[in-house]
Amino acid sequence: MTSSFDKQGLIDAFECLDEELARRGVRAELFVVGGAAMAIAYDARRTTTDVGAIFVPTDVVREAAKEVAEQLKLEPDWLNDGAKSFAPGNDSAQTSVFEGRFPSVAVASPRYLLAMKLLASRTDRDIDDIKILYKLCGLSTAEEGIRVLESYYPTRIIPARAQFIIQELFPGERPRDRDT
């Protein structure tokens, strides 16, 4: 079993999740981040292997997602909450992308996602997303990216990886050190 979702594949999975939640009579909220948020809302060419999300009620959504995995022949953890420990809190600018009868699905705003992507700074997976998010946020300098990261993660040290990626995107421009 392998899962690879494009925008339509994500919608199909959410429709199936809607049916499973309806069987249980339970309403749920999902806040999608990472590659799935990019694929469904910000980059039509993007695909993802899973759906990273924060969801409630957690146990019921997990059970329903397992049923969806069986029905659609997806990986058992196609819907997971592995990124929740990296989420910087509430996103007042989130966007609704799917309103079923039982689940409500929203994605993180471009700035929120940019902060998460910069914090993770996985060069193999995040650089293209970072470029798209920079553009969507109307940013054009290294300093602006650092400010977004600091605004969502004010107590975290900016990883060297993030500085490296930003320097790669803006050669010749050096982001300021946090202490200056």
Stretch-by-stretch model annotation:
Residues 1-180:
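Compositionally biased terminal segments of proteins
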